Amino acid sequence: MKKIFVFVSILLLLCGCAGQKKEEETVPQEIDLSSLTIVTPKGAPVLAFYDQIENENYSRVTADAISALWTGDASPDILVVDLTSGIKAIANGVDYKVAAIITFGNFYLASTGNDDNETMDAGDRIVLFGNENMLPNKLWHYLYGEEYDEGLLFEADAQQAAAALASGNYSDGTAVDYVFLAQPALFAALKKNENAKLYADIQEVYKNKSGLDMIQAAVFIKNTVDSATGNAFLEKLEQSINAAIEDPSLAEAGLGVYTGDEATAQYGFNPAVVVNVFKQKNALGNNAMGLGFRKAIDIKSDIDAFLSIFGMNETSEEIYFQ
């Protein structure tokens, strides 16, 4: 009897140890993301990384510096760039996949107060920024066709377009009626012209026409990053973005690492203005900066529809990080 008792005790002990070992084996190990190198352009995408400002592996560069980072020793693990540029880079053979979309449109059309009937008509002077090959013009013609081509004028960049809205005049002094502009430049320009006002939310116009959400900045992950690490990074990014949307003071605190002129130099924007805009809602009920998070593969149809505006082909699932 004593031998049976000892045998049962040992058996229970072994079972307990085995159970403990099994439990220890199934506890997921936290993935270290601290060594991942991240590069974003200055501007709106920085808002998504408000909690990474003090991360020594996170860099912010001017938009025109991104193209040199797709290859070579300086190419980061995570690269944020506008969707179309990234898809074209992949088509040209760079070692990345598209992983997520983090901005969903911050374009608006504002009136300067110069249009007597306050209704956009053929012949009204309308300012776009960039040139005929850039997103504002491509998007404009997708939404409005050629009806207003007679009055279209182009400023070199968003800052000059903002100046046109603030003054009511094109850079050569010509009076203008409407200005196509992005946030947060719109916010600042409206403050400078008491007659100016919002005329159309381009995100809403796009949604009504296409039935889909607009897409702008995308996250690309280098192929050398394994699936577990990449997905852990995306999960953390989604959580931090959603937290800031729920509580904009988190973004405000994160961006507060730099202040004044140094902040503008670091981020490419005045953080006080951006947080103000971020707290506002657009016509679709989303934050006015268009910040959000969706895994790219989950909205492939939206991506393909957006790319079609540029005459680009439907994407293959092979270029998506999963």
For the regions a protein language model found, what residue spans apply to each?
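Ligand-binding "clamshell"
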Residues: 88-99, 188-207, 265, 271-274
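Pocket-flanking alpha-helical
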Residues: 47-48, 63-96, 107-114, 162-171, ...
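Bacterial signal peptide processing site
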Residues: 18-21
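Pocket-lining segment of extracytoplasmic ligand-binding domains
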Residues: 154, 159-254
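Secondary-structure end/capping motifs
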Residues: 225-309
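A structural signal for short loop-to-beta-strand junctions that line the ligand-binding cleft
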Residues: 37, 94-102, 125-128, 204-211
